[in-house]
Amino acid sequence: MSKATAGPERAVSGLLSVARLLEEPRLARLYSFVLREGEVTIDEITDELEIPRTTAYSDTGTLVELSVLARDDDQKTHTYSAVPITLTATLDGDEYTVTPTLVDAFGRSPHDRDLDLLVEKYGLGKLAAALTYAVPYANGNMSERVAARELDLQYAFGVAVLQALRDVVHEMESVDPHFEDIRDAREYPPATED
């Protein structure tokens, strides 16, 4: 690759890699697991995620091709480690950064009824918005009542989503090197119509 095209090619490839993680919860879950664990083998992946060995090989291969996992071939038993991702998008002056924490939340959705329903009914954007409220909620800086109301979800459902995301926040805060880039809803109040 020439130096003149390295930046744009790398940027667009990174964009497509993040998009793929946010399209396939199974890949997102695997990526997040490897990121949390640091360095893993196929056996550890199959044991912990309870997926077939062929699926583990196929999915790790896909993630290596996407450059979000690195494979160490120096040992007899190959190990995999995650490459921390981040993607910042700006639309009409509004900026949002996708970090491994959102990828983890999405990867958990098929295994968590509340997150699954949120994504199915409202889409990935609502999950991203909920995460911006879950961070201050999980850290005790926002009540669940305020967070649920601001998310514009039925109260009990909003609280259930926040509680599911609280676990994501607590587990990813020390692992996600871009955690501080997650928007905090307290700093960006909802837009009001004129």
Range-by-range predicted roles:
Residues G38-E48, S143-V146:
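Short acidic, hydrophobic short linear motifs in intrinsically disordered regions
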Residues V64-D74, D167-D176:
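A short, conserved structural fragment
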Residues R26-E39, K126-N139:
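Short amphipathic alpha-helical interface segments
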Residues I51-T62, Q154-Q163:
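Short amphipathic alpha-helical interaction segments
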Residues D47, E65, R149:
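Alpha-helical residues within the helix-turn-helix
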Residues V12-L27, T41, D74-E95, R183-E193:
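Short, cationic-aromatic polyanion-contact patches
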Residues M1-V18, E173:
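N-terminal leader segment of winged-helix/HTH proteins
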Residues T90-A129, P136:
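Amphipathic alpha-helical dimerization/coiled-coil segments
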